[in-house]
Each structure stands twice: as C-alpha cells, then as structure tokens.
Design a protein with these regions (language model features):
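N-terminal secretory targeting modules
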Residues: 1-38, 191, 257-286
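Conserved SGNH/GDSL esterase-like catalytic core that processes O-acyl groups on lipids
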Residues: 6-8, 16-106, 112, 118, ...
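Short loop/turn hinge sites at secondary-structure boundaries
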Residues: 53-60, 182, 250-255
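Alpha-helical cap/lid subdomain in secreted, periplasmic
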Residues: 73-235, 256
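Extended, basic/helix-rich recognition subdomains
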Residues: 218-276
Length: 286
C-alpha cells in the first residue's frame, strides 16, 4: 500500500459507476493517490469501441465518448491525455456472456492501447449478471436461455478465457456481486410490461436487496412506470465495486476500508459488501 496510480477505464456504464465511491475510498487509504478517467459510451461493446475509434481516425471532430466530468472526447484523446499506469477493458453487459463477441475486437483494442501506451498494464474488469427481475434472465426459459446464475457462469468463463489468452489480471467485480447473492437477497419481481403498467408512482414499488437494480423511471404526467433498471449497480453496489477496485489497485484488504458514504445508512450491508470484495479478490483466479 502507498502509491499513486493513473487509471483509464475504456468501457461503458458498468465502468462509469466507479466514479461514485472509488475516488473517496482511495482518499481514505493512507498514502494512496488515484487519477481516474473513464472513456464512456453507454452499452459500448468491444466491437463498438473499434468502430468509434476508426470513425474518429477519419474525422477528428467525432467525439462519441464522455469523460468522468461528462465532457466529449474521442478514444484517441483519452489515450493521449496522460501516461497511464493501468488501462482497463471490458465487454458490454448484454453480450458479456457470449464468448464469440469478444474477438477479434479485444485484440484490436489491445493493439491500439499498446501502440499509444506501451508502459500501461492492461487489465480486465469482470462485469456482473443482472438482477433476477430482468425479463431476459428471470428464468432459464427466457430470451437468453439463462437465469441469473447462468448468466454469471457464462460471462465468468468468457472473461477468464480472455484473461488467459493475454495473461491479463482481472478485477473480479462480477464475482463480488455474485458472492453477495449467497444469502438470497430480495430480487425484483419479473419486470414485464404487465407488471410495469400496473404500477403507479408513488404507490409502493417492488424493492430489491441485490447489488444490481437501482431505480424506477416514470411518466411525469400519468405517474405510470415506464422502466425499471435491472442491470446497473445501485448505490450499495457501487460501493461494493469501489471496494473491489481499491483493493485490487492498491493491494489493500477491502475489509480494512474505513470510508462509509453518508448516503448509505445500512452499516451492516456495507460491512457485508467489504467482506464480499475481500473474498472475491482472494478467490478469483484465471
């Protein structure tokens, strides 16, 4: 422990969630400093990163990403902004469980990174499976033919295969989320259109204790529920992700983290998530 790191995440909303608590967690660690930047496009797959890079190469005014401060930029600009110590990559969640979607795009992205930042260590963030209320994975008979555990099993295998191929280290955020599910926290009910159209704000809405699944969106006029987020981390999940990343980057035990956000009052849940982060870092292996 005790170091300064410059980290660039090339990803999507599953990396953007690191900005919520990771910086404050690192500030609470003795003698640790983090410069964090996130090259973000919502739902961006490895394939799309390459497509956007090529478009920006042809048209330098093409800036499809936003950074950690919500400013537009191209991937080329991100890669040249600093001499990065660590650059992370990840697959988009909706295809993370499909191994065939990783290549040749991962190899192309890795080549681009190595050409511009040969000094940087490239790592992988393992993403997570959705809240079980998501209609694509609510049961193994749904659209993807997977339930929550099945989605994690597939994405875990896909990320592990990628890591083995390139000898990359992995930030096991997805494993940490999965470990918090061992005691069967409340999942959202099946969030199909029939249920959503029956819900009217501010009537009691289904709740979840899972790390994923975070908020409701409603029509401002009728109050009818339009969408339920079943895929992104909620605030407690973002704290979990921050603990995993802090432990990984600075080689500290997440259970030793003392920072607890003022907006997260459930201290027992925070402690549980620190323990899950610790367990994930200890147990994960390629």
């Amino acid at each position: 422990m005790g170091s300064a790191l410059k980290v660039l995440m090339v990803g999507n909303s599953f990396s953007l969630s690191c900005r919520s608590y990771l910086p404050d967690i690192v500030k609470s660690l003795p003698d640790c400093e983090l410069k964090l930047e996130i090259a973000y496009i919502g739902g961006c797959s490895l394939q799309r990163h390459i497509r956007e890079y090529e478009t920006s190469r042809q048209d330098p005014e093409h800036r499809p990403y936003t950074d950690i401060a919500d400013r537009p930029a191209s991937l080329q600009e991100f890669l040249k902004r600093d001499r990065w110590d660590i650059i992370s990559i990840q697959q988009a969640s909706h295809c993370s469980w499909q191994p065939a979607t990783y290549e040749p795009w991962a190899e192309k992205l890795i080549t681009i990174i190595r050409e511009t930042n040969p000094q940087a260590e490239i790592i992988i963030q393992q993403t997570w499976s959705y809240n079980a209320g998501d209609i694509r994975i609510n049961t193994a008979q749904d659209e993807w033919g997977l339930d929550q555990a099945g989605m994690f099993s597939c994405l875990n295998a896909a990320y592990r295969s990628l890591a083995r191929k390139y000898a990359f280290r992995v930030v096991p955020a997805g494993l940490a989320v999965q470990l918090t599910r061992k005691d069967s926290p409340r999942q959202l009910p099946r969030m199909d259109e029939k249920l959503k159209t029956s819900l009217v704000y501010p009537a009691p809405l289904p709740e979840t204790d899972d790390a994923a699944g975070r908020c409701w969106y409603k029509d401002s006029d009728s109050g009818k529920i339009l969408c339920a987020d079943t895929i992104h981390l909620n605030r407690y999940g973002e704290y979990l992700q921050g603990c995993v990343w802090a432990g990984f980057l600075f080689k500290v035990s997440p259970e030793s983290i003392t920072f607890e956000p003022a907006d997260l009052p459930d201290k027992a849940r925070l402690a549980k998530y620190r323990s899950a982060a610790e367990q994930a870092l200890q147990e994960y292996s390629v």
